């Protein structure tokens, strides 16, 4: 009953090819510093994820109330 035109194997291979190479061995130090450090040190926060302040998310879009790059 799957409506997808992809078989699971095809989908997996497609995703494998599409994934960016640096992610395979974890994030590199440059990307880690860019993504992780500002979130943790400029925006100290402790609490449940659903109460995380939107303004701390750099790609949060206030108009659509969503985070850019995620469905």
From Swiss-Prot:
Classification via InterPro entries: Adeno_PVIII
Keywords, ordered alphabetically: Capsid protein, Host nucleus, Late protein, Virion
GO (cellular component) term, any one: host cell nucleus
PTM field: Cleaved by the viral protease during virion maturation. May cause the middle segment to be shed from the capsid.
Residue(s) at site: Cleavage: 1-2
Short name of any one Pfam family annotated for the protein: Adeno_PVIII
Domain of life: Viruses
Induction, as annotated: Expressed in the late phase of the viral replicative cycle.
GO molecular-function terms, A-Z: hexon binding
Miscellaneous comment in the UniProt entry for this protein: All late proteins expressed from the major late promoter are produced by alternative splicing and alternative polyadenylation of the same gene giving rise to non-overlapping ORFs. A leader sequence is present in the N-terminus of all these mRNAs and is recognized by the viral shutoff protein to provide expression although conventional translation via ribosome scanning from the cap has been shut off in the host cell.
Protein family per UniProt: Belongs to the adenoviridae hexon-linking protein family.
Subunit-level organization: Interacts with the peripentonal hexons as well as the hexons in the facets. Part of a complex composed of the core-capsid bridging protein, the endosome lysis protein VI and the hexon-linking protein VIII; these interactions bridge the virus core to the capsid.
Protein name: Pre-hexon-linking protein VIII
Naturally occurring in which organism (per UniProt): Canine adenovirus serotype 1 (strain Glaxo)
